[in-house]
Every structure is written in C-alpha cells, then in structure tokens.
C-alpha cells in the first residue's frame, strides 16, 4: 500500500471489520487455491492478517507483507493470539517484493491492489516470485468498463481515502495478466456491501472530505445509483452502497 496514513491510524479497526474478517471470499480463495501441505503462500498487502491466517491450516508456510509498520504489528499480534506458528508478517511493498524468483506456490492479494502505486509493476513482481504453474489469487473491487462509472467510483474512493490509487477495470487486469504470462480466469463476481458510517470511520475521513462524498453520492446518475446500490435517507444522508468485487485467478505459464 502506498499512503500509509489511514492504515497507520486505524489498523485495529481493519482487524475487526467484518468485510475483511468474515468475507465468504476467503473460503472461495482457499477452495480455488487447491492448497497442499508443502505449499508456501505469500499474501501481498496483508493488512491485519486475515488472508494469511485463513490459509495457514492448509499449507506449510504463509508470509504476509504490508507497507505499513502498524499493520504488520497488528497482524503479528493477531497470529500470536490465535497460536498460529506457520505465519509471519514483514514490511514490504508490492512493487519490490523482497524474495527470490520462483519462491511461492500461491500468492494472494485481497482488497489491497487499488492502493498500489504502480499496479503493473506489482503484477510483474508477482509473476517473478511465483513458481511455474503457481496460482495468483486476486480479490478486489473493480471499475466498470464505462468510463463515466469508472471515474465515479474511483473519485468516490479517493475522496474517502487519499491512499486509494485506482481500482482497475477487468479489461485492464486481463491485459496485465497476459503481459506477465498469467493465465487469466474470472472465478466469481459479487456486490460488496458497504455500510457508509463504518466506512467513513475506518477511513478517518475529515469532515470537509465527507461533505464532498455526500454531495458526490447525492449527485449520482440513475445508472451510478443502480450500479453501486446507493441508498440515501430522506435527508440525503448516505446509508449504504456497494462496490463491484471479483476473485481473479492467474496461473503462471
């Protein structure tokens, strides 16, 4: 992740947030990965450690990397609390992974790629450290192909969190995978429900930015309201919306 501030300030909130802690996509990732006892797993943008900890019973070792020292500390203490011994966390960036070529059987990245300063470089790094026939499992929210809706959702997320760089479209992901010999496959798409109040609190969004967000949501087109499931109360205060999420698999060829 690039801008460390929101995660540094609110690391504990990310550990307890249901979107990260209890998402059904975790089980889907594990099922898709076809884990074996001898596998080594790398989780990029590990956050509070939920993904690495979820994989840990099925593999030999999980390593989680995150750009923020505070997140690494939270994830490490979380693993210690759970008594998990085959997981470790360290500071590092997706664009410069501190590992040799062909190091991992499985690489995961869950709700983090939209923070990467150079997502294309990050995908190149994934392909470098992934073993031949290894699996890259990516979960993130994505932008619609319609450029107006793309700009709407990326602007919304940047208003709330300056560390948001860009949620890519699926055609962009396909191109990045193809350029790095990763065989692309859509595994599953879903709407990711967002409760407005907890989303704002978790992001540590200043009051002036929140006013801009409320205006942005109130001025949404009918198509944007439908696409992102925007719900407002009678006073125009946001209640909830959704982001478009996907699990993508890339097998290194």
From Swiss-Prot:
MF terms in GO: methyltransferase activity; S-adenosylmethionine-dependent methyltransferase activity
InterPro entries: Diverse_substrate_MTase, Methyltransf_11, SAM-dependent_MTases_sf
Top-level lineage group: Bacteria
Keyword Transport tagged: no
Residues noted as binding S-adenosyl-L-methionine in the record, renumbered to the chain: 45, 66-67, 94-95, 110
EC number(s) on file: 2.1.1.-
Record-given protein name: Uncharacterized methyltransferase YcgJ
Gene expressing this chain: ycgJ
């Amino acid at each position: 992740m690039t801008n460390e501030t929101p995660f540094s300030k609110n690391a504990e909130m990310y550990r307890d947030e249901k979107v990260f802690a209890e998402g059904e996509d975790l089980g889907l990732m594990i099922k898709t990965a076809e884990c074996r006892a001898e596998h080594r797993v790398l989780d990029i943008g590990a956050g509070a450690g939920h993904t690495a900890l979820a994989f840990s019973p099925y593999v030999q070792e999980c390593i989680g990397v995150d750009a923020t020292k505070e997140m690494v500390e939270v994830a490490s203490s979380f693993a210690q609390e759970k008594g998990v011994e085959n997981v470790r966390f360290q500071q590092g960036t997706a664009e410069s992974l501190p590992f040799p070529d062909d190091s991992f059987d499985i690489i995961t990245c869950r709700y983090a790629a939209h923070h990467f300063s150079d997502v294309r470089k990050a995908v190149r790094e994934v392909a470098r450290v992934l073993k031949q026939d290894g699996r890259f499992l990516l979960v993130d929210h994505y932008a619609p192909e319609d450029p107006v809706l793309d700009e709407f959702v990326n602007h919304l997320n940047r208003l709330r969190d300056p560390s948001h760089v860009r949620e890519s479209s699926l055609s962009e992901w396909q191109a990045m995978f193809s350029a790095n010999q990763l065989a692309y496959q859509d595994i599953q798409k879903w709407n990711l429900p967002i409760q407005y109040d907890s989303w704002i609190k978790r992001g540590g969004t200043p009051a002036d930015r929140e006013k801009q967000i409320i205006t942005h949501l109130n001025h949404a087109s009918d198509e944007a309201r439908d696409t992102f499931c925007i719900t407002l109360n009678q006073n125009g205060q946001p209640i909830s919306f959704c982001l478009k999420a996907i699990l993508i698999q890339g097998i290194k060829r």
